[in-house]
Amino acid sequence: MDDKAASPTGKMQFETQPAEYRHWTLSVEGEIARLIMEVEPFAGQNDKIELKSNSYDLSVDIELADAVQRLRFTHPEVKAVVVTSGHDRIFCAGANIYMLASASHPFKVNFCKYTNETRLAIEEASAQSGQKYLAACNGATAGGGYELALACDDIVLVDDGSSTVALPEVPLLAVLPGTGGLTRVVDKRKVRRDLADAFSTLAEGVKGKRALEWGLVDAVVPRSKFADAIAERARKLAASAPQMERGPGIELGPLEPRLSDRAIEYRYVKVDLDPKARTADLTVRAPDSIPKNAAEAHAQGAEAWGIRAARELDDALLRLRFEHEQIGIVLLRTEGDRDKAYAAGEAMMGLDWIFRETRLLWGRVLRRLDVTARSFFAVVDEKSCFAGPLFELLAAADRSYVLDVEGVAVRPGTLSGGALPTFNGLSRLQTRFLADPKRADAVVRAGKEGPIDAGRMAELGLATVLADEIDFEEELRVAVEERASLSPDALTGMEASYRFAGPETLATKIFGRLSAWQNWIFIRPNATGETGALTVYGKPDRPKFDWRRT
């Protein structure tokens, strides 16, 4: 399979806009938006694979992710979003099976990770931006289609005697629902364990009345009354949204990165690639100026550093995942005016909706970094400005290498006190100092007092290695070469285990348990071997299993 989305450059395109959507229609009327899924069968990543029955591939989910983010920035006045299908009697059949069967293992993993991040963004929009989601399941709702519904606040299934909700992956394909389905059924909807077990082994799914009794949906409505019921529930959902600062919105323009075999360049972010060494330098530049107030922030719109730099970093991370699989180590660097980077972070704590959404955007991007399967080393030297939101890059890194010379300093701000939580619900500093939470508070207090120099960084526990000018480059070189020699599989598992110490949440269970099992199952012969269920799906052959339990 060609794992790259169609584009003039041959590179993947993670940006889009409503006028370019091929699979979704976004409309807004006052406080209520409608997202209608009507997948164009031969307009996916691979035009040889037909996306039947409103099934999706990455191109479909890229549009969904764009719509979710665009609603928050361009239409903050929206309080309820109705997600439904433009097809009669089919809501969504989930991820396209033939796409998955023909995709490489790394692509499968990154595809599922991306779809999980999009569903979590929907839930965050509900919890933090006051935009509630209603799944209007007007037909069969299976696999990833039901997982999309599970991310919504309210699920309504049409009661027509045939429409079902289903998670058929285990009985049909010998894999797991890859977008959080199992976790949300029991953790979010709190379906009884035995019923959840039965549900997830019923390939045909569960119809209306039973789906309601089991807690799989919130309402079932006859087809003749469905449209009116959805409209009424959407109005009630909008009325239940919290009172908060909203609008007017801003437009999200294109990023237009410059792409080559050795670099990915944006206005504030640059990735220098060294394919031979399997390393990359990811540098984020501090702002040249920051808005003094909300009016200036609105005037700058999506071109403001806080929004644009975060979007650029997000796009860069996705390109590293999908286009540069063999880059295993990323050196995180920053450059520019440290004071302005710090001030930009403090401005994000403002009350206006645009500051709130900028702050939440940085949170999503940093969490995408947290679950990106790369080794991240922060490099703190004379050019660095790890301050404000950029300090979180250091806090997110697996290690930090600090040059011990005068002038080298970092400066965490208010954001690092909990405004940008990881998936475990804690700040990165709280996760770092799990044994003594007061140390996290001490770091934030120190940053508010002024820059923290290299020696003080070591005292506060912010430096993995502190080295002088003579040893610094050699220490870093040896560490990178050593890391590059280790198994990427083992490193991914080790890093994921260490990055989320502390409490478990829905998200950590999805990424740390469900996704980990799914990634293992994806390479097992029972799923993807020559006679595995995913391989022979749609063929006359029956799957042949290795019956040993492991």
Regions found by a protein language model. Give the residues of each.
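Well-ordered mid-protein domain cores that form the structural environment of catalytic cofactors
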Residues: I97, A101, P106-I122
